[in-house]
């Protein structure tokens, strides 16, 4: 057993946050409560079913049924145990793009009772070092497409093995249900930006993951042998919780792509009889532009929009051009992934209402295992259509932030998960449907990824040489939010070249898309804290612009 370390003073908040309709998380809502139990069930009932089809970036393709998948997991378990002495409770950092190796490895680690720590393969070296310091990993395992600067830092560590595939001999005597893993043991640490430049590690238990998987199965009517397409990266909460764990739990067939396959997306969708695919709004925007007129996808029920708010215009454009419905979902790493989703069996009338009646499309109703609510400005339950902060309670709520009692206490203050998102609910046929209207916090959500402005400022610190600057997120229809850099410096060719050089050396995920050479004072409190929401107003003219790899430079 590997219990999550929690300050006893915070225990009551934590326990209250995990109540679901008055039921303690110690009273289980599901039968299979650990990954080893799920694997044991698959061995009994799913051996011949298709499990994984992979499309690589270089026309690579691989297909596994559950019998072969389980065999590969066993081989990697053996490799982890015998070659690296990985045991229950060990943290293992995993860095790779989507591929069969990383898919198998994540499951193998959790089946051992080890804690997998997926990290972005394009992560900043500075942030990566902070993650390493925080989790103190037993091993760092690398796979495909690791960014060169990050790879250099990783290579400086001792004895970094690559992720194996089909390694070693099968160990058929291994019993999944004899592994000694408990429901409340940590299974994964997903890193997300906080209100400081230090990343926060969201620690989720086996039970957290599997209650969410049950909820996903109910809301999307998952049944054995359904086909789920995964494009989003497996280090992201949506892909990890929905595509990996949710599909494994439901005995689904996953079609895994190493990235967005472009125009071939539609062929993959049709050839594999995809039933459901989870996409970010930006991917939906791209697919709207490259849709093949006249194509029909009879197997596809709908697209799930995730990771960032879905603009109404994008939703209506996509539906009009493709004839494919979009069911928006909402969640955070802190509650596994989805906490609310538009259900599979919604009526046509209600679907039209929640898409068009309000200024933003609905994120749906609460998922099984958790409950959404809205607190008004006075901190009490909001009335119908009254805006406030969205909060979540239930059995999917995280164990806490790894090694950070203070941040855990703040997040679960008052016995509920405070999301930092503003929204409201509207009762439709006796059920609360929720809507997200904005952000309470300053975190930038770009293409579904949480990024701290302070992290970006730390990456660009050399700009202080030419002037005071600040980073803010601003609304953008394509990405949800974009990164804006405001700098108090003269608009000269020398300064332009210097900023270009600094931005070019910055990881792509942190690169500003608009740079304003300003003259107005950067808004701040008396203590110097940047008022980013006010600063964002200076970037409002770029809400409809799509950006390339180079930033736009503006003289104010």
Predicted regions and their residues:
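Conserved ATP/PPi-binding loop(s) of AMP-dependent carboxylate-activating enzymes
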Residues: 362-369, 380-410, 449-451
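AMP-binding/adenylate-forming catalytic domain of the ANL superfamily
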Residues: 506-530, 544-556
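Conserved AMP-binding/adenylate-forming core of the ANL superfamily
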Residues: 30, 48, 52-87, 93-99, ...
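Conserved AMP-binding A3 loop
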Residues: 63-67, 187-211
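AMP-binding/adenylate-forming catalytic core of the ANL superfamily
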Residues: 123, 394, 399-400, 410, ...
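Conserved AMP-binding/adenylation subdomain of ANL enzymes
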Residues: 210-227, 237-276, 289-291
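Conserved pre-ATP/AMP-binding loop-to-beta segment of ANL
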Residues: 48-50, 173-191, 197-198, 221-227
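Gly/Ser/Thr-rich phosphate-binding loop
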Residues: 274-279, 288-357, 371
């Amino acid at each position: 057993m590997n219990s999550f370390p929690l300050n006893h003073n915070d225990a009551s908040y934590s326990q209250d946050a995990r109540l679901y309709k008055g039921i303690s998380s110690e009273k289980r809502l599901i039968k299979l409560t650990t990954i080893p139990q799920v694997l044991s069930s698959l061995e009994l009932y799913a051996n011949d079913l298709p499990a994984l089809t992979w499309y690589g970036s270089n026309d690579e393709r691989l297909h596994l049924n559950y019998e072969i998948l389980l065999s590969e997991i066993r081989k990697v378990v053996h490799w982890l145990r015998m070659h690296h002495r990985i045991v229950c409770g060990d943290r293992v950092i995993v860095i790779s793009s989507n591929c069969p190796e990383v898919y198998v490895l994540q499951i193998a680690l959790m089946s051992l009772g080890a804690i997998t720590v997926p990290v972005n393969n394009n992560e900043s070296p500075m942030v990566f070092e902070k993650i390493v310091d925080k989790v103190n990993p037993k091993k760092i395992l690398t796979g495909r497409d690791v960014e060169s600067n990050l790879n250099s830092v990783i290579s400086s560590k001792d004895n970094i093995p690559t992720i194996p595939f089909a390694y070693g001999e099968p160990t058929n005597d291994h019993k999944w249900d004899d592994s000694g893993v408990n429901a409340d043991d940590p299974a994964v640490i997903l890193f997300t930006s906080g209100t400081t430049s230090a990343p926060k590690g969201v620690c989720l238990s086996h039970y957290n993951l599997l209650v969410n998987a049950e909820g996903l199965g109910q809301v999307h009517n998952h049944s054995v042998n359904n086909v789920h397409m995964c494009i989003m990266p497996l280090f992201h909460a949506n892909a990890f919780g929905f595509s990996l764990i949710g599909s494994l739990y439901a005995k689904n067939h996953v079609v895994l792509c190493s990235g967005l396959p472009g125009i071939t997306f539609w062929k993959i969708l049709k050839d594999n009889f995809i039933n459901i695919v989870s996409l970010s709004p930006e991917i939906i925007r791209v697919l709207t532009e490259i849709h093949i007129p006249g194509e029909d996808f009879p197997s596809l029920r709908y697209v799930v929009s995730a990771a960032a708010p879905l603009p109404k215009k994008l939703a209506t454009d996509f539906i009009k051009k493709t004839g494919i419905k979009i069911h928006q979902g909402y969640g955070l790493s802190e509650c596994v992934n989805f906490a609310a989703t538009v259900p599979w069996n919604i009526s046509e009338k209600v679907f039209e209402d929640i898409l068009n009646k309000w200024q933003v499309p609905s994120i749906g109703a609460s998922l099984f295992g958790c409950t959404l609510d809205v607190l008004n400005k006075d901190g009490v339950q909001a009335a119908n259509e009254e805006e406030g902060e969205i909060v979540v309670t239930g059995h999917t709520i995280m164990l806490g932030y790894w090694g950070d009692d203070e941040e855990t206490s703040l997040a679960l203050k008052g016995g509920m998960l405070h999301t930092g998102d503003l929204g409201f609910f509207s009762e439709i046929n006796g059920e609360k449907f929720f809507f997200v209207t904005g952000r309470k916090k300053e975190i930038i959500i770009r293409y579904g990824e949480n990024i701290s402005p302070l992290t970006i400022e730390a990456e660009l610190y050399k700009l202080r040489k030419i002037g005071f600057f600040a980073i803010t997120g601003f609304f953008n229809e394509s990405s949800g939010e974009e990164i804006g850099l405001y700098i108090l410096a003269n608009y000269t060719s020398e300064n332009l070249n210097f900023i270009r050089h600094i931005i070019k050396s910055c990881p792509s995920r942190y690169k500003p898309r608009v740079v304003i050479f300003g003259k107005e004072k950067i808004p701040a409190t008396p203590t110097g804290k940047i008022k980013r929401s006010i600063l964002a107003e200076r970037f409002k003219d770029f809400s409809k612009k799509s950006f390339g790899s180079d930033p736009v430079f503006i003289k104010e």
